Each structure stands twice: as C-alpha cells, then as structure tokens.
C-alpha cells in the first residue's frame, strides 16, 4: 500500500516522466484493472509532492477596462483567502467612511461655499445682461419655453398684439435692437454653461479629495500588505480610481430603494461595489507541498471550471464572482490524474486537455460556446498559466488507439509507464508481498496473517499469475481474499488469519 511492488520498469518510467521538465513529458500509466496502479501512483505522487513547493493561489477580479474579461490575480499560497476577506471588509468600511464624510456638516458648508462663488459669477453676468437689455429698451423674462426678450416703450411692456400695430419703421428698429441683444444673450448663456461646467469640475475635484481622504487610509493598509505583488498593487490602484469615478452611484446605492419589492426580488439598481469583491478560484492555504488531484469524474466543467449563472427576473446573468475553478486549477503546480475510461466518455474534456497542455494555459470556457451551440456573449476570463504533470491511467489498449489515431497525443504524452500483471516470485518480492499484507491489515483494521496464512496468499497469487515462478500484481483481487479470510478468522474467534481461513 505504501510502495509500488514488483514494477521496477514502471517505477523508472514514472520517475523519468515526473522529473523531466521539458514540454510534452506527461505520462500514460497502463495496466490491467486491479493491479493497484491508481492507489500506488497517488501514494507515490503524494510522497514526491511533499518535497515540492506549495503553488500560488489564484483569484479573479473585475477588469475595469473590459468587464467581460475578468483579470486573473496570482498570489502566494494563503494570501488569496486573506485578500477576499480584506477586500470584503474594505468595501464595508469604505462605504461607511464615504457616507460619514459626505453627510457631514463640514462637507455641506464647504460645498456650498464652492458653489456660491460660481453662483455669484452667474448673477454678475445676469445683472450685466439685464442692464444691456434695459439700455436697449427691453426686459428679459423667464418663461416656460426659455428666456424671452420683451420691448419696453414709455416704461410699458409691449405684447405681440401691440407690437404688430406699431409703424413698420419702429418695428424694424426694435427688431434690429432685439437681434443684437439676442446675440449678447447667447454669448452670456454660453458663459453660464462654462461656469456650470467649471463648477461641476470643481465640485467633482472636491468630492474626490473628500473621498480620497476618507478611504486612502484603508487602502494604505491593503497596499502595505499586498503591495509586493505588482499585479495586486495595480489592481488596488484601479479600485481606487474606479471608486472616485463612481462616487455618485456608490453613495446613491446606500439610500433606501424606491421600489422595495424589486429590491427584495433581486432587481432594482445593482450594487456598484460588487465589482470590488475578489473571487478566489484556487486556495492552496492548507497545502503542504504540491497538490495531487485524482479526478474520478472528468466532465469538462469539473476539470476546467465553469461560469455559473443565476436567474434574475426570468433572465440568466453572470459575472466574474461566479467563476468556478476545476480540478485542473486545483492541480496546477502539481499533479492531475485522470482515468482514461471516464475521459473517453467525455470527448470535450479530452480536447480541452490537449489545448491546455499545448498552449500551457488554463482557459475557462463554456463547452456549448466552444462548440457553437450558444451565440450569446459570455465572460472570457483571463487564462491562467498551466504548469502541471498530467497522468492518464488506464488500459493499454486505449494508449495504442490514441497513439496511432491522434497525432497530438504523442506530442503531449511522451512517457508510458506500464504496470505488469505479474512479477517474478523472488524472495525479495515475496517479502514485499508479506509487507503489503501487513500494511493492509494495519490500514483497514484487519487481523494480521500468520506464516501459514501468508504462504497461502502467496500460493494463491501464483495461481492468479498461472505460473509457479510468478506472482500476480492484481492487488485488488488479493486484498479481497484477505478481507474474506479476515471474516472467517473473526467468525472462528481466531487471533490471526491462518491457512484455513485463506
């Protein structure tokens, strides 16, 4: 159970394939069912993995330049979960700090003071315009459709009917003066708009200063902790800029919803701070060494991840927080073991595996979209670099089918380790067989075998091998015999498993 017995050639091939770093030296481990190759390989890899370094954590974060292409963020093992918690805490503290700052009396008075200067400028312009209108014999009045220029004759406002009965020469002279005043008024209104834009820019600048003061202390703590990771520092800088550009939405989202029912049903205005969350897809915080992942159900999404969706008002929606990694993500930096029989039932997984190994990149892509069944636009997460030894385990017949029928297979699975169904019946191998029986008893809490029991199992193994000079390596079958013998030993109240029980 703890070492590979009687498979010297397979061990050498396994060691070679695992140690060589060049491209394409992944392994196909062939052998009959029941030879214990899966268990032996996992045990062997787990021992080797302990000597290797723990790989990085991986997160997906919002891409502020293109929301459809989430960015992948690499962090030292254990820091991914910390960043998730720290950003969640930052979001809540940031919202509270902004709310307190923008609802303070000091902010209100300083904003009013800033705006008053611009209102004074506009009033001064309006006074000048009114004076020009008065000098030209007009009054400017505000109506429902805008500003209206009304003529004044002998101190009286003249309406359209009165204007129409004036002599033509007087009407023409009034129209000339009105046109000149209209030009003056258009110029003044352009100045009004310029003042409004200047006021808006000044208020926006002031708001950013207030927001920066409120949240920079929070961000400084994050930068101190994660600043050595360049991508993380850039991400935190992008978060800061996005908050400053979306202050109105962030502050507005904290107000009670206008439609409580829609909010309860998941509708209404989306939370603008959701995109500052961090989605941890690979968490290696609990690893001690490299990962060893045995994927028994190698469906496409289970191996290569997926983007989940949720229903909102009858429509399926998704975002980067719903990206889920697969077993290939979990095994990245270590070892991924796939059974060929199950892989053969999932051709989409096999094709994706080849692309991943050839491109050295992990891409999360919907299988339906890849095959053209779905035309709607979906997320395209940034690929993650893939550095992993892939070990396919299964019948040798599949190996030859793939080797002869798939030109790409031989480029990416260059090492074959074959587990023989028999081994020589040497004294050393018999002793290893006895050690195997002892380990099985210890692991499963079975009774130990005395010498006659061990001898009987060895003889049974030779019968399985159909050769007195050989021993069978079908350890699954041999293990079942020992388990059955243990039942009879317990039934008879025997302390050990004997020849009779076997």
Language model segments and positions:
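Non-catalytic accessory segments flanking P-loop/AAA+ NTPase cores
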Residues: 1-502
């Amino acid at each position: 159970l703890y070492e590979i017995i009687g498979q010297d050639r397979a061990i050498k091939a396994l060691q070679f394939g695992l140690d060589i770093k060049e491209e394409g030296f992944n392994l196909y481990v062939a052998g009959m069912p029941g030879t214990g190759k899966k268990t032996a390989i996992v045990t062997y890899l787990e021992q080797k993995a302990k000597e290797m370094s723990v790989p990085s954590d991986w997160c997906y974060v919002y891409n502020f330049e293109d929301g459809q292409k989430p960015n992948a963020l690499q962090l030292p093992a254990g820091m991914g979960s910390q960043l998730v918690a720290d950003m969640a805490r930052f979001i809540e503290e940031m919202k509270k700090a902004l709310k307190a700052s923008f609802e303070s009396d000091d902010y209100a008075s300083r904003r009013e003071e800033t705006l008053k200067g611009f209102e004074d400028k506009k009033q001064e312009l309006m006074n000048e315009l009114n004076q020009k209108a008065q000098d030209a014999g007009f009054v400017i009045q505000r109506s429902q459709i805008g500003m209206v220029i009304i003529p004044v004759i002998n101190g009286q406002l003249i309406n359209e009917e009165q204007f129409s009965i004036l002599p033509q020469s007087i009407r023409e002279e009034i129209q000339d003066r009105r046109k000149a005043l209209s030009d003056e008024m258009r110029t003044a209104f352009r100045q009004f708009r310029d003042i409004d834009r200047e006021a808006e820019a000044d208020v926006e600048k002031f708001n950013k200063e207030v927001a920066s003061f409120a949240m920079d202390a929070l961000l400084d703590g994050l930068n101190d902790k994660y600043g050595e990771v360049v991508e993380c520092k850039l991400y935190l800088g992008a978060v800061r800029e996005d908050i400053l550009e979306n202050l109105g939405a962030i502050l507005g989202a904290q107000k009670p919803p206008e439609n409580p029912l829609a909010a309860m049903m998941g509708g209404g205005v989306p939370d603008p701070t959701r995109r500052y969350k961090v989605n941890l897809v690979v968490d290696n915080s609990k690893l001690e060494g490299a990962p060893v992942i045995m994927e028994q159900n190698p469906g496409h999404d289970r191996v290569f991840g997926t983007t989940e969706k949720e229903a909102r008002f009858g429509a399926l929606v998704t975002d980067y927080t719903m990206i889920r990694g697969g077993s290939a993500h979990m095994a990245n930096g270590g070892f991924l073991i796939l059974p060929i029989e199950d892989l053969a039932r999932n051709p989409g997984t096999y094709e994706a595996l080849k692309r991943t190994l050839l491109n050295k990149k992990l891409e999360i892509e919907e299988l339906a979209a890849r095959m053209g069944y779905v035309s709607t636009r979906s997320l395209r997460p940034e690929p993650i670099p893939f550095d992993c030894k892939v070990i396919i385990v299964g019948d040798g017949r599949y190996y030859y089918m793939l080797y002869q029928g798939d030109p790409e297979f031989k480029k990416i699975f260059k090492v074959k380790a074959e587990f023989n169904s028999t081994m020589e019946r040497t004294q050393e191998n018999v002793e290893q067989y006895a050690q195997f029986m002892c380990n099985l008893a210890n692991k499963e809490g079975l009774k130990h075998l005395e010498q006659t029991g061990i001898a009987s199992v060895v003889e049974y193994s030779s019968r399985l091998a159909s050769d007195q000079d050989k021993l069978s390596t079908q350890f699954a079958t041999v293990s079942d015999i020992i388990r059955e013998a243990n039942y009879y030993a317990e039934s008879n109240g025997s302390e050990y498993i004997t020849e009779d029980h076997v």
